[in-house]
Structures are given as C-alpha cells and as structure tokens.
Swiss-Prot record:
InterPro entries, alphabetized: IspD, IspD/TarI, IspD/TarI_cytidylyltransf_bact, ISPD_synthase_CS, Nucleotide-diphossugar_trans
GO MF terms, alphabetically ordered: 2-C-methyl-D-erythritol 4-phosphate cytidylyltransferase activity
NCBIfam families: ispD
Protein name: 2-C-methyl-D-erythritol 4-phosphate cytidylyltransferase
EC numbers on record: 2.7.7.60
Disulfide bonds: none
Segments forming a coiled coil: none
Species annotation: Mycolicibacterium paratuberculosis (strain ATCC BAA-968 / K-10) (Mycobacterium paratuberculosis)
Site (Positions MEP for the nucleophilic attack): R164, K219
Keyword Transferase carried by entry: yes
Catalytic activity entry: 2-C-methyl-D-erythritol 4-phosphate + CTP + H(+) = 4-CDP-2-C-methyl-D-erythritol + diphosphate
Function recorded in the entry: Catalyzes the formation of 4-diphosphocytidyl-2-C-methyl-D-erythritol from CTP and 2-C-methyl-D-erythritol 4-phosphate (MEP).
Assigned protein family: Belongs to the IspD/TarI cytidylyltransferase family. IspD subfamily.
The protein's annotated pathway: Isoprenoid biosynthesis; isopentenyl diphosphate biosynthesis via DXP pathway; isopentenyl diphosphate from 1-deoxy-D-xylulose 5-phosphate: step 2/6
C-alpha cells in the first residue's frame, strides 16, 4: 500500500522540489537535555540552520519538518513561511512518513535531510538536485573514507578489512524521484534495519547515484561535533 501521504505516487510534472527534515529525535548522544535539532550553534538552532541551507540553495521550493509534538509551536516560530511544521513519529522512518504526508502539491523530487547536518553548504544541495534533473532517480552525497575500516563480530573479533576504495561515507540531503521514494516507503513498511532512505530505495531495486559530498555536511552527534560546528561558524 502506498504510504499515507499527500503526494501522488507518480512523478510530478512541475519539476518542483520539496525537502523533508525529520527532526523529532531526542539526540541522547549529544546529552544536551533538549531535542538535538533545537540545540543552538552560535545562537541559531540546528533545525533553523538546516532549513536555511535548503532554502538558500534556491533549488528547494518547500520544506516540511517533523519535530516532537511538544515543540511544534516553537519550531513554527523559528522557521520561515516556506517551511511547514508537523509532529513527528516514534522513529525517523515514521517522521519521514508524516512529513511526506504534509508536502504540498506534487513535486517531481523530494530531498530528505538531517537537521543534524546543520552546516551543509547550499552548493551541495544544488548538486544533488542537479543530478536528479540530469536523470538519476536517487542521489546521495558522499565522501571517500580515509580511515581503515574493520568488520568485526559481536565479540569484537576482526572478520575482515574491506577495501576503502569502494567505500563512501554517505551524507544528506538524499534526493529521490517522488514516485520512487513513495514506492520504497510502501515496500519498507514495518521493516527494520534501514539506516537511511537510500537503503529503502536499494531494497526495491532502485539504483542510487553518488555525487561529491562536502566535509561541512558532517553530522553533529556528540559534544565534540557541536564544538567543531561552533568553531566553524565563529571563524
């Protein structure tokens, strides 16, 4: 069944772009005492900075954010008129579904962006959208890995060392043809184990294209990440 959403299951003909930002998580690893998306970086919340980056890219027509139910009014005060605020769900997937349901019209493409990647440059967002317009139906920004990666078992015993050349660290926003994203969410309903939206698309056989990421699109997860973000903003 197609997810409960305001979007039609066909790709929109208008060429417009919507972005959804699931921001209802608690952010326990950041240990800030408030939902992570509402933590401030030099006076502006991560959520406000993430939404501003999307709109400053000039390629996003509307943004829908999903926040904790008790933070909806606060988010509405923080965000501009081009952003719609809805109450999020129990997990990220549920929040994306609720945000999709509130997307107006029938956009051709949908971006899914992490509020915690608050410093993502507008140029990166434009790069993802351009790849969609060039004909790719699923696009993720990513960076090469510089550290050696080990596969380990439950006891910490190394099972192998994957070749770094074929590995990438994936960022957001991840972009999709609207019909493909809806189909992926419909097929993945009730299925656990997907860590990003591109994984859902891969699950239904969709091909995902990688474009160059950006170091500034790092995910703010710990206090050290937050300190780095504040240092960058204040420089």
């Amino acid at each position: 069944m197609v997810p409960e959403t305001g979007l039609a299951p066909e790709t929109g003909s208008s060429g417009t772009v919507a972005a959804v930002v699931p921001a209802a998580g608690s952010g326990e690893r950041l240990a800030a005492g408030i939902p992570k998306a509402f933590c401030e970086i030099d006076g502006a919340s991560m959520l406000a900075r993430a939404v501003a980056g999307l709109l400053d890219s000039k390629v996003v027509d509307h943004v829908v954010v999903a926040v904790p139910a008790d933070r909806v009014d606060e988010a509405k005060r923080l965000l501009p008129g081009q952003a719609t605020v809805v109450a999020g769900g129990a997990d990220r997937t549920a929040s994306v579904r609720l945000a999709l349901a509130a997307v107006p019209g029938n956009p051709a493409f949908v971006l899914v962006h992490d509020a915690a990647r608050a410093l993502t440059p507008p140029a990166l967002i434009a790069r993802v959208v351009q790849a969609l317009r060039d004909g790719h139906r699923a696009v993720v920004p990513a960076l090469p890995l510089h550290d050696t990666v080990k596969a380990v078992d439950a006891n910490g015993v190394v099972l192998g060392t994957p070749e770094r050349d074929g590995l990438r660290a994936v960022q957001t926003p991840q972009g999709f043809a609207t019909d493909l994203l809806l189909r992926a969410y419909a097929a993945g309903a009730g299925t656990a184990g997907f860590t990003d939206d591109a994984s859902l698309v891969e699950h239904v056989g969709g091909q995902v294209q990688v474009v160059d990421g950006d170091p500034l699109a790092f995910k703010i997860t710990t206090q050290l990440d937050l300190l780095l973000a504040e240092t960058i903003v204040r420089r």
